[in-house]
A protein has these predicted regions:
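Alpha-helical hydrophobic/aromatic positions enriched in membrane-embedded helices and signal peptides
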Residues: 64, 71, 86-90, 115-118, ...
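Auxiliary, metal-adjacent structural segments of Zn-dependent hydrolase domains
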Residues: 2-74
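Short pre-active-site segment immediately N-terminal to the catalytic Zn-binding motif
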Residues: 74-92
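Short, solvent-exposed loop/turn segments at secondary-structure junctions
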Residues: 40-43, 81-82, 97, 106, ...
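Short hydrophobic helices that act as membrane-entry/anchoring signals
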Residues: 48-56, 110-120
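Catalytic Zn2+-binding segment of zinc metalloproteases
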Residues: 79, 95-114
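Metalloprotease/metallohydrolase-associated module, dominated by Zn2+-dependent proteases
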Residues: 12, 19, 23-29, 112-196
């Protein structure tokens, strides 16, 4: 599950951009892949209600801001329509990681790892690691599209998501998340990532 950034331009203008090319690659890799609007599916609405309840109202953006891969489909939030080409591209890079995790683990195993090790709330190591693998790709894609400074600027938001209610306080250890983040930035710096 990834939260949307802001956006405008090419996704709205109808120009074929990098996110469309990435979608083509994803559809080749995952032939049954589809993008669906979350609000159109009762299960997604039920998940939104359940998350709002178990997080004591802390996660109220599930339908409006967060996108979710479930059963090989990408369920997009209301924000998808307003995202520009770069935002969609970065999001799709993140979500493709989840599609690959699903293929590697299978639906049941991935759901169990996501929900239970160690606890469903507060210390969810399985969810933290699944999401971290995808957030590495978010950071890398951001650096590719917008430069290292933009990638560095993601730190506080990603830490907030890990230690806060968005993902059920999945890893409430900000120093650990900052260390993980720093490791990714260091690897990008070592690669000499050019500015866009």
């Amino acid at each position: 599950m990834a939260e949307t950034a802001h956006g405008s331009s090419s996704a709205k203008s109808g120009a074929v951009g990098r996110h469309e090319r990435l979608l083509d690659e994803i559809r080749v890799e995952f032939p049954s892949f589809e993008i669906r609007a979350k609000r159109g599916f009762p299960l997604q609405r039920a998940i939104a209600v359940a998350l709002a309840i178990v997080t004591l109202g802390g996660q109220r953006g599930y339908l409006s801001r967060y996108h979710t891969v479930l059963f090989g489909k990408l369920y997009v939030s209301d924000a998808w329509k307003g995202m520009d080409d770069d935002d969609r591209y970065i999001l799709l890079r993140h979500e493709r990681v989840h599609l690959r995790q699903r293929r590697r683990m299978g639906d049941l195993t991935m759901a169990l790892v996501y929900l239970f090790p160690i606890l469903p709330l507060f210390v969810a190591w399985g969810r933290a690691r699944i999401e971290w693998e995808a957030y590495i790709e978010t950071i890398r894609a951001t650096a590719e599209v917008r430069g290292l400074d933009a990638a560095r600027a993601l730190e506080s938001e990603i830490v907030r998501r890990y230690v806060g209610p968005d993902y059920g306080w999945m890893w409430p250890f900000p120093r650990a998340v900052r260390r993980w983040f720093g490791d990714v930035i260091q690897s990008l710096e070592a690669e000499g990532r050019p500015r866009p």
